Amino acid sequence: MRINPTTSDPEVSIREKKNLGRISQIIGPVLDVAFPPGKMPNIYNALVVKGRDTLGQEINVTCEVQQLLGNNRVRAVAMSATEGLKRGMDVVDMGNPLSVPVGGATLGRIFNVLGEPVDNLGPVDTRTTSPIHKSAPAFIQLDTKLSIFETGIKVVDLLAPYRRGGKIGLFGGAGVGKTVLIMELINNIAKAHGGVSVFGGVGERTREGNDLYMEMKESGVINEQNLAESKVALVYGQMNEPPGARMRVGLTALTMAEYFRDVNEQDVLLFIDNIFRFVQAGSEVSALLGRMPSAVGYQPTLSTEMGTLQERITSTKKGSITSIQAVYVPADDLTDPAPATTFAHLDATTVLSRGLAAKGIYPAVDPLDSTSTMLQPRIVGEEHYETAQQVKQTLQRYKELQDIIAILGLDELSEEDRLTVARARKIERFLSQPFFVAEVFTGSPGKYVGLAETIRGFKLILSGEFDSLPEQAFYLVGNIDEATAKATNLEMESKLKK
């Protein structure tokens, strides 16, 4: 991390001597620091505590000012563990917010919240840095072009297409496949994407962060031999980090992405896994700062904190940031304040369903709950729009009939309804797809399906052309031709058994 020029600079040394405080209280990750009268630091300024603990181990803790308490005291939140700190230790006000390295030097590297490399590959060039707190682009700078961002995932491209330069949310409870879906999107988009990507791991499992790093090295997205040719920068603040780090690591990743957009004028992909942990960390910090909790125990500033982050993730006339964010849904309740606040900022929502995951349909994307502002005839075209609407109507009718089927059975339905149910079950299975990143689990090679192929496949199912084929032929296949080939194989297998 580089906040200011080196401390050997005499001007900086004088200012540091002037702006020296003392720790007056420590409660977990929160420090109260007393400063001389008239030398109070600003909100969001970085404070650094250096010294040695009782065992002689070196201490270097960076904090961020959150409150001015009066009586020349400030309250700050630590970005790393506070073990070894004690009252009376010197604290230096750095005079600026946290600043992190940006630009080409960040590619192929893993950083923590302070912008320090944590991959044991040596130091990073810190000549170009940027503060993590800044205002969103002015309204007049924003870009309003509308175009589809193809992912190669059938259910997403057909029913809830993503916007290039937009914000996308992947909503789901624990264990329904958010991280697998985000890794597949990285695989499909980041590899084919000409620009750069930034991945922010916010409060998730360290193992998943390690898996992602290894996978990116294998696929060539990170080039170990020549890091400058890498296409991604990784910023991690995992589950074991203090709440201050988890609350700010998203801003560190966003700051790196903003530099590529504004200075290099590139199209950037920003992946955040998981935005709920950002809210959760904010809630922890809010309680530590003594604020009165709001609904369900969340911080009273929830909407403001979310808005401050999300408004910076946008596309300008210089370049774009396309953001894909995983959102954990506590107890599968989409009305919980954290996911509900996130909904308002998104162009497309991909909702993952536990019911579909239980059926073994992966990706477990709920075709009726997932939405997109892009699914309009003037944007996607009449053919795409009509096909998507017919698929949704068929699945909605099947959903309505499920209670009748459960009580009376299929035989009691009309001929038309039985046909609808048969097609809906084929559609449901055809919405599943083998993923590249899940090959070890499914045993099937991953498939990328173009948008035109996706539309053709669903149109053929809706037209009744494949009414005679068994529904299992449509499960975990790529395009419709693979489904017909699978049906032929199944028929041959059944004949051989006889």
From Swiss-Prot:
PROSITE patterns for the chain: ATPASE_ALPHA_BETA
* HAMAP family in UniProt: ATP_synth_beta_bact (MF_01347)
Q: What is the official name of this protein in its record?
A: ATP synthase subunit beta, chloroplastic
How is it placed in the membrane, per its record? Peripheral membrane protein
Q: Lineage from the top down? A: Eukaryota, Viridiplantae, Streptophyta, Embryophyta, Tracheophyta
Which Cys pairs are S-S linked?
A: none
- The reaction(s) this protein catalyses: ATP + H2O + 4 H(+)(in) = ADP + phosphate + 5 H(+)(out)
Task: Indicate yes or no for the key word Nucleotidyltransferase.
Answer: no
**What is the species of this protein?**
Olimarabidopsis pumila
Gene that codes for this?
Answer: atpB
**Which biological process annotations from GO are given for this protein?**
proton motive force-driven mitochondrial ATP synthesis
